Amino acid sequence: MAARRPGLIALFDVDGTLTAPRKVVTPEMLTFMQELRKVVTVGVVGGSDLIKISEQLGSTVTNDYDYVFSENGLVAHKEGKLIGTQSLKSFLGEEKLKEFINFTLHYIADLDIPIKRGTFIEFRSGMLNVSPIGRNCSQEERDEFEKYDKVHNIRPKMVSVLREKFAHLNLTFSIGGQISFDVFPQGWDKTYCLRYLDGFNEIHFFGDKTYKGGNDHEIYESERTVGHTVTSPDDTVKQCKSLFLEN
């Protein structure tokens, strides 16, 4: 068996990269990741919290990968152990947080879209996730909203309003997944996790939303990473085989 390549890590987005959006990882992908882990250090970085990442990648996720960065790395695990956390509440303060949440809920209340469900704002330790349709919609409703959003630009328009209204808070708005966007302080995008990877001189990042405004863009563009755009989990496997397993 080939020895692990020192100083190199392969870092993966979750949705659209290791799994279909919000779907559970396939057994084939899990097996492939374990094979890959024999030759390179492997990490995952997702915008979701650890509970959601575990639902997609499995309950043993923090042990299946060398590094697991949930909420863009604001909650960081290495070899199964928690190594760092950051809190939006302590960073912004309750008053500013409340001002933002109140305005956003008013905006959604006035929004004319075909359907609305529930959980329009999800508070995570390092970010807010905002969904105009509501996070507890069905998968079918998710798919429908995604199509509707592509035509009517519900999320981009909402982000534009919030960005202007709350310019003084220096927030980043990142559209990801099918139905929502993340809101967090500038610099708390996926590049945040790189502070834990100083021991690596070659960081390969794989993600699907690497375009400007996508939640993989900043880490993809970072001078510290070699960025790879993927179109699906199958494409991720194909690119990794070519890069790490066939030479």
Swiss-Prot record:
Catalytic function, reaction form: alpha-D-mannose 1-phosphate = D-mannose 6-phosphate
UniProt entry tagged with the keyword Iron: no
List of residues binding Mg(2+) 2: 220, 225
One of the protein's GO biological processes: mannose metabolic process
Key words, A-Z: Cytoplasm, Isomerase, Magnesium, Metal-binding
CDD domains: HAD_PMM
GO cellular component terms given for this protein: cytosol
Keyword field contains Secreted: no
Active site per UniProt: 13, 15
UniProt superkingdom: Eukaryota
Gene3D superfamilies xrefs: 3.30.1240.20, HAD superfamily/HAD-like
Cofactor: Mg(2+)
EC number(s) stated in the UniProt entry for this protein: 5.4.2.8
InterPro entries: HAD-like_sf (IPR036412), HAD-SF_hydro_IIB (IPR006379), HAD_sf (IPR023214), PMM (IPR005002), PMM_cap (IPR043169)
Residues annotated as binding Mg(2+) 1: 13, 15, 208
Positions in coiled-coil regions: none
Top EC class, one word: isomerase
List of residues binding alpha-D-mannose 1-phosphate: 22, 124, 135, 142, 180, 182
Function of the molecule: Catalyzes the interconversion of mannose-6-phosphate to mannose-1-phosphate, the precursor for the synthesis of GDP-mannose. GDP-mannose is an essential sugar nucleotide for the synthesis of D-mannose-containing cell wall polysaccharides (galactomannans and glucomannans), glycolipids, glycoproteins and the antioxidant L-ascorbate. Can complement the yeast temperature-sensitive mutant sec53-6.
PANTHER family in the cross-refs: PHOSPHOMANNOMUTASE
Family under the similarity heading: Belongs to the eukaryotic PMM family.
Protein name: Phosphomannomutase
Name of the encoding gene: PMM
